[in-house]
């Protein structure tokens, strides 16, 4: 017989089912994670809620994969188990928090009674403290909630999902085993979660818009600089419209790659201080007004803090404030302000932008060199990429090399420039490729170094298991290149064991389901790029790209030198 509380419910539903139906509502179709005894019963609810269980090789990789999935899909979910599982994932969650990536982290916990009694259970620290792990997550989550009471479980779930979306950062939900089947009111599901941004105060917003327009109309050579938070806080439509209406020269920071249509007439390239193309650097740094949208001024995003633009010439647009020169307007999100700026802009005088293309530099065109170098390869990559590709680059040479690639339209760029956890890109590739498959099978391309690959290569197994077909290029240059440029060029700690990389998928049960390649010359890579079969991505493909150990993009060398000097 149902208890009194259940009989009072109009549409009783189990907490786990309610949670997973809410995930489906906000667009999640696949859930990453690793099964554990405290989350197993909850996983039984996934199929009936229209959700696919991915099943990763470990929780860290699952967290990276959820991150990649969220960057393509908009939001992601991760399920781990208490203690050992959630702590394995915590590095990935910290990276998502750092880089504004929305992940709903669901942690299966022991029975509420066991927690109350302080039992000495497995996966605990042996001290009866069952809050210690959720406390660890508080600093890297917008909100943490324990679903240990039917009275407010639905409210906590809805609020957490809304906070995750609005702030574009992870949230943490603890689900004790005894609460999985507890009944709550399912009638709430008829009302979708409100994911709309809180409106700005109209009077304040209008004032900020007037101030922005005053400086913009007074400027002689203004430019637009777009960065990562324009992507994360979903103002790309406003950015596109601002570019169209104003015609202003538009540049992106490294973390902003993919935010702007790079085939647009106003696109001028990547600005990263001294790591920039000279023409880009000159135009940005000589501008008398920079409209900076969603900036993250980290060391790797600015080529070692080498920006030469003053706050006196800058208007910063962010998700929670707008700063005009040295005056800050808090509690004013950029989405509403940008929309009104676009509507009221009128005529603006715009300078032409530097010509950016994927043409090879002259010294590379005329070279008889057959070794594959970064200066030669990245423009070639730009020529090979297709519209709507998803391009993932690992921390290291790939992250910096991609600056020299002009994307076709519709490309999504994924990297982890701020958090910079090596190995991230392999897990992110699995999640991104899965989201792409759900959306219609956009091509997913990964560039990763041989050193970084060794941290997370198990996710190639997950790619095979889920029938994903990314093209994975592995830069084989005998170890940790960016670390060599920072410190210890010839030291053994920057070396790695050489692997037969193109043969790895066989060990993961992928025999006959993938293709492996090894290229050591420019002619070989050019021939591979020209192959229609290869470029159509019919299956998972793994390419060893052998490059000189001493070679690196110029921007990496500049940034590494700055990092080395700060470490002394």
UniProtKB/Swiss-Prot annotation:
Mg(2+) binds at residues 450, 477, 479. Keywords: Decarboxylase, Lyase, Magnesium, Metal-binding, Thiamine pyrophosphate. One of its GO terms (molecular function) is magnesium ion binding. It comes from the Eukaryota. It holds the Pfam family TPP_enzyme_M. It is an enzyme of class 4 (lyase). InterPro entries: DHS-like_NAD/FAD-binding_dom, PDC/IPDC-like, THDP-binding, Thiamin_PyroP_enz_cen_dom, Thiamin_PyroP_enz_TPP-bd_dom, TPP_enzyme_TPP-bd, TPP_PDC_IPDC, TPP_PYR_PDC_IPDC-like. Thiamine diphosphate binds at residues 397, 420-422, 451-452, 477-482. SUPFAM superfamilies: DHS-like NAD/FAD-binding domain (SSF52467), Thiamin diphosphate-binding fold (THDP-binding) (SSF52518). Binds 1 Mg(2+) per subunit. Its EC number is 4.1.1.1. It catalyses: a 2-oxocarboxylate + H(+) = an aldehyde + CO2; pyruvate + H(+) = acetaldehyde + CO2. Pyruvate binds at residues 37, 123, 483. GO terms for cellular component: cytosol; nucleus. The keyword Magnesium applies. One of its GO terms (biological process) is aromatic amino acid family catabolic process to alcohol via Ehrlich pathway. Its cofactor is Mg(2+); thiamine diphosphate. PANTHER family: PYRUVATE DECARBOXYLASE (PTHR43452), PYRUVATE DECARBOXYLASE ISOZYME 1-RELATED (PTHR43452:SF30). Homotetramer. This is Pyruvate decarboxylase. The gene is pdcA.
